[in-house]
Curated annotation (Swiss-Prot):
Sequence positions that bind Mg(2+): D71, E139
Taxonomic source organism: Thermococcus kodakarensis (strain ATCC BAA-918 / JCM 12380 / KOD1)
Region of interest (Amidoligase domain), ranges: 1-265
Binding site for CTP: S13, D146, I147, E148, K186, T187, K188, P189, T190, Q191, K222
Primary gene name: pyrG
Family: Belongs to the CTP synthase family.
Name of the protein this chain belongs to: CTP synthase
Keyword field contains Glycoprotein: no
Binding site for L-glutamine: Y54, G351, F379, G380, F381, Q382, E402, R459
Binding site for ATP: G14, L15, G16, K17, G18, I19, D71
Amino acid sequence: MTKFIFVTGGVVSGLGKGITSASIGMLFKARGFRTTNIKIDPYLNYDAGTMNPYQHGEVFVLDDGGEVDLDLGNYERFLDTSLSFDHNITTGKVYSAVIEKERKGEYLGATVQVIPHITNEIKERIRRIARDYDVVVVEIGGTVGDIESMPFLEAARQMQIEEGRENVAFVHVTYVPRLRVVGEQKTKPTQHSVKELRSLGIQPDAIVARSEDPLEDSARRKISLFTNVPEEAVISAYDVEDTYEVPLMLEKEGLPAYLARRLGLPEREPDLEAWREMVEKYKSLTDTVEIAIVGKYVKLADSYLSIKEALKHSSVANDVKVKIRWIEAEDVERQGVKLLEGVDGIIVPGGFGARGTEGKMMAIRYARENNIPFLGICFGFQLTVVEFARNVLGLEGAHSTEIDPQTPYPVVDLMPEQRDLDRLGGTMRLGAYPVHIKPNTLARRLYGREIVYERHRHRWEVNPDYVEKFEEAGLVFSGIAGDDERRMEILELPGHSYFIATQFHPEFKSRPMRPAPVFRGLVEAAKKKKYGS
């Protein structure tokens, strides 16, 4: 019988429900249970694909092409797994499905309502995923009390009745602030949040109390008393330097063991040795390198969350800690490349639109001409081609037709299959595609094999009409699409300390124990630049 753990949030948003959910899933998987995570997003968008990174953070892309919430990236990294588009349930998906069924007459003339039709659709989607697993962790986005999340909380309440209380548990993540004036942790916000949750028919089985420092015993006792939750199930989750410490914290606090007992699962010791070694190694690193990320969304670091994590994974692999220098591309346009002085490596990440493109190309040129390790991703790959066309081939005015439709040298152009589309959502070249890597290249050395599958999210590509000119000038296209040999996937510059760019997003498949090869190579080159071989 599948066991369900619903994770809800209270008091304020941004407490780390995603990391908590990922950690719970990882700890059950470490006990040998077949485990997966589901994220519920109460917004009306069908998916995350058209959402502004400043509002929602990065759009994470799955193997099957799903454009999803960044929390699914955390799930994949913590559980070392690959999820599907169905693992992200949104209000937009649910309502679209119900309306489509109503139009087809599947409800036999019934009045279609939130209860039971919307809640039934939610439950069916959760159960569809759950069939192949022992434990399913379901994170319900938003904060208890939000109108948007009401149908999902109601569906979760119903599932506890239908599946049996012994098969469904609730974990509520709350905030316990410390008021400087009185110097004590305040539990009243948690009490009121649980009161709100109980008014919806849900009694939490465990409370994860987020705080700046460890939860005091007096606060733990008070939370237990006023929320009807055992003291052992009031979990202290205080701020830590590295999110990968959270599973170890929750394990020490006894949360997974308590939930296993609550759900009638057999007691098992978790295999956390490799994870613990990874965390301890990262904390012990003393040597550092500084890598600049030159982008258009750097004011919100979550816009590039998977890149941050890939650099962290590569830190452990290379025995050196990466310090990130966040640089707004438009600031490079205004202040020049002096903003890049002293860095050991440069990344130009993906993005859309004209803002900051010249600044990004200034950063690319600076890396190319000064032998600074460089990695370009997606739009960064395309702008690397544009920069090379302008400053090496001498093609004045060369550009991508995305930015300049009238450019005399369209070295980056819209893919043919994209030209007649009339909608934005879900229509890009999305998901995992095969990439064929040429022998005797940097890319082949990094990946160690001929064919790799990497995740994509783009509409534009290198114009194949210009490939020969680039290669004659010394640029090497070392990776080619497996589904179209005219589509360039990886470029590199021989003789440079490290200069590589990819049309795909390597960060989406990076894992704590298995860093993405191009990130690992970048950090290795940055370390060599700073400290020598």
